[in-house]
């Protein structure tokens, strides 16, 4: 797991202004409110999405089976399992916030962000639905059948905005100066 955390730190630090160390992801792994999914490349041919832990903090063995997807890897790229990107969800009672999502820079623009987001959101929605079915009354099940995913993105991040719209997110508001002076956040939602 340490190797994976090192890769997450590397990907985070090449994508975000605020630099972090191992402790950043280690603490998330311990927190019950966070869910982390990674997009892996295996042998330059197959990619798969894997949830790093279940609610007990143990690695989730049930969601890591290879899922074949068409990839855009060249034959000369690394032929070993490595992390291409990750997504961090933060669960609340009413919704799930996409806390952070990043793809390693050299793999951006190839559709991996879309695969990571759609696969992980689908799996998380399925897990939440199963939990609701086990824990709620019949009335509560019908009242809360929708999963809401929320995210915020810098309005200047055109590539990310395009991806989020493509996978069904809708703009619901703007937070002025959220990232600093003249750096506004677009708040987006997707119901699953």
Residue ranges with predicted function:
Residues 19, 170-171:
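Short gly/ser/thr-rich secondary-structure transition/capping motifs
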Residues 104-118, 154-162, 166-167:
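Conserved glycine-rich acetyl-CoA-binding loop
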Residues 3-68, 74-106, 114-119, 123, ...:
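Acetyl-CoA-dependent GNAT
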């Amino acid at each position: 797991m340490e190797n994976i955390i090192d890769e997450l730190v590397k990907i985070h630090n090449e994508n975000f202004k605020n630099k972090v160390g191992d402790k950043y992801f280690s603490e998330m792994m311990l927190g019950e409110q966070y869910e982390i999914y990674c997009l892996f490349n295996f042998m330059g041919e197959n990619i798969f999405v894997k949830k790093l832990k279940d609610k007990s903090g143990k690695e989730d063995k049930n969601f890591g089976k290879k899922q074949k997807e068409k990839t855009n890897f060249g034959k000369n790229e690394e032929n070993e399992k490595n992390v291409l990107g990750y997504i961090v969800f933060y669960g609340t009672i009413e919704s799930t916030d996409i806390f952070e999502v990043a793809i390693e820079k050299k793999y951006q623009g190839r559709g991996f962000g879309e695969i990571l987001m759609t696969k992980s959101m689908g799996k998380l929605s399925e897990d939440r639905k199963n939990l609701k079915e086990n824990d709620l009354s019949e009335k509560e099940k019908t009242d809360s059948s929708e999963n809401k995913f929320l995210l915020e993105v810098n309005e200047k991040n055109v590539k990310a905005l395009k991806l989020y719209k493509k996978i069904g997110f809708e703009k619901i508001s703007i937070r002025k100066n959220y990232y600093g002076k003249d750096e506004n956040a677009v708040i987006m939602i997707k119901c699953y």
